[in-house]
């Protein structure tokens, strides 16, 4: 892990009046960049030339850093270019996937918003389970391997893969049949299979809850809630049951979009309690813990109990559903507030208070 002192030494050489907020052109970059501009920051996007159109048309980026391929962002010349523009990187799922988690931890020497040490706790299922379970949150039962399957389960794989390759099954035979099918299609590799994560299939309504923890205010804020729109499962459920059987299509769970939702108000105390517990436990496990945005993906069962099946330890894709504010984020100030602008506000306040060390790593 890059020492915090080394990152702070890099930041001390910056022109503090000309900080540039930067991210990779994908995932949640539109509201990250727009939010930064609304708070008076210069912005830059890292992109390939064929993916630059949205950032030009929407006018969210002041500068463009072009790469031949997104994995080039870990190269030293790109890092130096970022340092030369006094960059603070806002990481999202695509940034981590393209840069590589090992590089983020050990070689990417550009100041980054949030706690880069916690990103591995999201990526590795055992660490994620340790953090969620240790927080006292209700999580699905975990299975040690396919031979233990004794009922409906969901099979997942590590990394930010947007649900690709996930599948439900109910027996060890069905598990291996679907594994073979996905391997034949090139969706899964032997390495993926060795890291398969098998958990109880929880029946309930899906709520992806977006929080922001402010280390400057020591406060957990509810920013918004969304649901995923997934292919092909959301298309298959529109097909009558008898026709589904005839089609004999195994559903996939690839996230293609998101839509905003609100949760019944009587569940909000539970929502805030979950966020508070996770933040407290994260400080114990990987100090300074959750800094800035994070997400708890949950299912609400018929007993009105929220079961957390996954977390994001950085800005989650569902925050795109409230680029102009959510029914919850607007309650804090009465003004529209995106997650991107909330991040920029925290950076701005940290600079004003000379407490930037509290929000970057």
From Swiss-Prot:
It catalyses: 5-amino-1-(5-phospho-beta-D-ribosyl)imidazole-4-carboxamide + formate + ATP = 5-formamido-1-(5-phospho-D-ribosyl)imidazole-4-carboxamide + ADP + phosphate. Mg(2+) binds at residues 297, 310. Pathway: Purine metabolism; IMP biosynthesis via de novo pathway; 5-formamido-1-(5-phospho-D-ribosyl)imidazole-4-carboxamide from 5-amino-1-(5-phospho-D-ribosyl)imidazole-4-carboxamide (formate route): step 1/1. Keywords: ATP-binding, Ligase, Magnesium, Manganese, Metal-binding, Nucleotide-binding, Purine biosynthesis. Pfam families: DUF1246, DUF1297. The keyword Lipoprotein does not apply. Its EC number is 6.3.4.23. InterPro entries: ATP-grasp (IPR011761), ATP_grasp_subdomain_1 (IPR013815), IMP_biosynth_PurP (IPR023656), IMP_biosynth_PurP_C (IPR009720), IMP_biosynth_PurP_N (IPR010672), PreATP-grasp_dom_sf (IPR016185). Residues 116-348 form the ATP-grasp domain. Binds 1 Mg(2+) or Mn(2+) ion per subunit. ATP binds at residues 146-208, 230. Belongs to the phosphohexose mutase family. Catalyzes the ATP- and formate-dependent formylation of 5-aminoimidazole-4-carboxamide-1-beta-d-ribofuranosyl 5'-monophosphate (AICAR) to 5-formaminoimidazole-4-carboxamide-1-beta-d-ribofuranosyl 5'-monophosphate (FAICAR) in the absence of folates. This is 5-formaminoimidazole-4-carboxamide-1-(beta)-D-ribofuranosyl 5'-monophosphate synthetase. It comes from Methanococcus maripaludis (strain DSM 14266 / JCM 13030 / NBRC 101832 / S2 / LL). The lineage of its organism: Archaea, Methanobacteriati, Methanobacteriota, Methanomada group, Methanococci. The gene is purP.
